[in-house]
Amino acid sequence: MEENCDSTENPHSQGRQNATKCGWLRKQGGFVKTWHTRWFVLKGDQLHYFKDEDETKPLGTIFLPGNKVIEHPCNEESPGKFLFEVVPGGERDRMTANHESYLLMASTQNDMEDWVKSIRRVIWGPFGGGIFGQKLEDTVRYEKRYGNRLAPMLVEQCVDFIRQRGLKEEGLFRLPGQANLVKELQDAFDCGEKPSFDSNTDVHTVASLLKLYLRELPEPVVPYAKYEDFLSCATLLSKEEEAGVKELTKQVKSLPVVNYNLLKYICRFLDEVQSYSGVNKMSAQNLATVFGPNILRPKVEDPLTIMEGTVVVQQLMSVMISKHDRLFPKDTEPQSKPQEGPNSNNNDGHKKVTMGQLQNKENNNTKESPVRRCSWDKPESPQRSSMDNGSPTALSGSKTNSPRNSIHKLDVSRSPPLTVKKNPAFNKGSGIVTNGSFSSSNAEGVEKTQTTPNGSLQARRTSSLKSSGTKMGTHSVQNGTVRMGILNTDTLGNSLNGRSMSWLPNGYVTLRDNKQKEPAGESGQHNRLSTYDNVHQQFSLMNLDDKHSVDSATWSTSSCEISLPENSNSCRSSTTTCPEQDFYGGNFEDPVLDGPPQDDLSHPGDYENKSDRRSVGGRSSRATSSSDNSETFVGNTSSNHSALHSLVSSLKQEMTKQKIEYESRIKSLEQRNLTLETEMLNLHDELDQERKKFTMIEIKMRNAERAKEDAEKRNDMLQKEMEQFFSTFGDLTVEPRRSERGNTIWIQ
């Protein structure tokens, strides 16, 4: 009863060589509703039926667009009838090409289901439905309008639901789901609907739906042509595993793109499922037993072939699940998601770097040239506390390495206190930059928080703190001292325990001990950190004999932020973003940098008093060193400006690329919109024509009914006239006979 009409073996099938399906069905028709056996051919969006298989002229045609297919359950009275009906669409305002229903009967249940699936695929295919039994490349081609995907949306939806709710479900993929629910979901997807799974949906039902989709693909994920090649890989695996894996990788790469992507997606998901085998009892072998026949199956499914290949297929599928990292390398993974822009904030995207990775990057950090993004975290406990007792060491030597001395002062009178928080990561040789503050810790792991009183910045400030407008450039740290925005005892006496700091490309900081330690009297000879992008500046100390080589690294981002304490009364916003124009255009006061080289502070009050005195006498010190500052800064300005120009040009190029990409997308969407509008206009015109036809047919039907009523009336009148005629004719014939009998002459 069922045939695929793709071949042209007999001459009569040449006109139907592009038919999707053909076979014998029984059709109910005529006024008496009798059953007639007809040869049906499904071609395009039309279902033709012929009197015989060899006929070329169809007896009729059913136009499928706008219709729907309904399956009739088997009745107990007629168990041998497998009925389905093609009826017009359920919407009243939706007119179809034919205004009548067709009741068809198949010989078997499987035959009926195949016909229903094929007809639904034709009806709902243009609307994204009919995916069960549809070719994989056709499904992927249609879903490309929604973006590039590794797997069809049905597979992704099932996998995402199982990831969320079913990875720990015992017997996953082994226990069957509810058959009626699976059937309902299948019909919904085939009708172009997109049903969503909620918390009440059974996990086993969704798993059964996924297996059903893979099982009903016209050609499995591994095509029929590759079946024998994959089986040979399994044979090679049993002899020599390494050679077998290489051959299997070669065969996997030779698959079509859509098949390769789907196989990779499924194998990675199944590997994730088997990682929970201690809970769900589904090991790689069990999953291979379930999915093997759906992924790898022969074209001719005779019992002997299936029996011979079952064990081999299970072994091969188990290898593909457990060794999917080698079979599907990540470097060949297509980009299915848009890349993040250079200014995107990826706070949640950064993975924590292990200690070994930090040390490896620390040893090679001078060779790190790519510009990376830096992640900023909100300070955990911005509390006010007194500074540690100690004597801060002021700067001595040249201060011309910073452009601060040749620009206007930055007014920070309204700035809330910044926070420098101790962090145990310093003991391990690493640190974290958090919203303009550097986290460190002492040897005892005591957590300390230091703030400046009255919301004013009265301490030394690095580029990462001072600029909250720092343009994320190259920072060189001399003699193992980290220049912080807030003074504490660790930076004064030990210079952060004699460790050198380097900024890694991912925004983290590593500290390590120097081989040489500077004398106590020279601990204050440091250079300011550079505030520019991608510029490796050379700094010189007053004493050239004490110069040490340090590591430098590059880190960059569009802007940096300083997080303000929530209990600050003077802050107007939670974060302050400082672009480069704020850095150059603002006024800045740094009494510590402008003060004398050596001062001792024992209490925060003394610190404030001395900083006030420095602010008075700082101008004279600036005047004496202005000539030195101008000479060095002129040389740095050109390189800094060139670096900024290169950064701006690269950002402009990136913006141009994004603009071109967005414009192309907009044009494609506009073109698609015009196409859809044209289709809508055509459909409206067709709808109007069909309505007019329907109106004409209604008029004809009413005329026919009136003519029928008139004919019945005439028939009644004729019937009465005939009865009267026969009754009158009978009376006329009976009376003459009676008169003749009365005139009889008797002869004796």
From Swiss-Prot:
It is found in: Cytoplasm, Cytoskeleton; Cell junction, Adherens junction; Cell junction, Focal adhesion; Cell projection. The lineage of its organism: Eukaryota, Metazoa, Chordata, Craniata, Vertebrata. InterPro entries: PH-like_dom_sf, PH_domain, Rho_GTPase_activation_prot, RhoGAP, RhoGAP_dom. Residues 18-124 form the PH domain. GO terms for cellular component: adherens junction; cell projection; cytoplasm; cytoskeleton; focal adhesion. Residues 617-630 have a biased composition (Low complexity). Residues 369-381, 600-615 have a biased composition (Basic and acidic residues). SMART domains: PH, RhoGAP. Interacts with FLNA. This is Rho GTPase-activating protein 24. It comes from the Eukaryota. Residues 328-476, 582-640 are annotated as: Disordered. The coiled coil domain mediates the interaction with FLNA leading to its recruitment to lamellae. One of its GO terms (biological process) is negative regulation of ruffle assembly. Its main location: cytoplasm. The modification Phosphoserine is found at residues 369, 391, 396, 398, 402, 413, 415, 437, 495. Keywords: Angiogenesis, Cell junction, Cell projection, Coiled coil, Cytoplasm, Cytoskeleton, Developmental protein, Differentiation, GTPase activation, Phosphoprotein. The keyword Cytoplasm applies. Rho GTPase-activating protein involved in cell polarity, cell morphology and cytoskeletal organization. Acts as a GTPase activator for the Rac-type GTPase by converting it to an inactive GDP-bound state. Controls actin remodeling by inactivating Rac downstream of Rho leading to suppress leading edge protrusion and promotes cell retraction to achieve cellular polarity. Able to suppress RAC1 and CDC42 activity in vitro. Overexpression induces cell rounding with partial or complete disruption of actin stress fibers and formation of membrane ruffles, lamellipodia, and filopodia. The modification Phosphothreonine is found at residue 452. Residues 335-347, 356-368, 382-405, 432-476, 631-640 have a biased composition (Polar residues). The keyword Manganese does not apply. One of its GO terms (molecular function) is GTPase activator activity. Phosphorylated by ROCK, leading to activate the RacGAP activity. Induction: Down-regulated after nephrectomy. The record marks 174 as: Arginine finger. Transmembrane segments: none annotated.
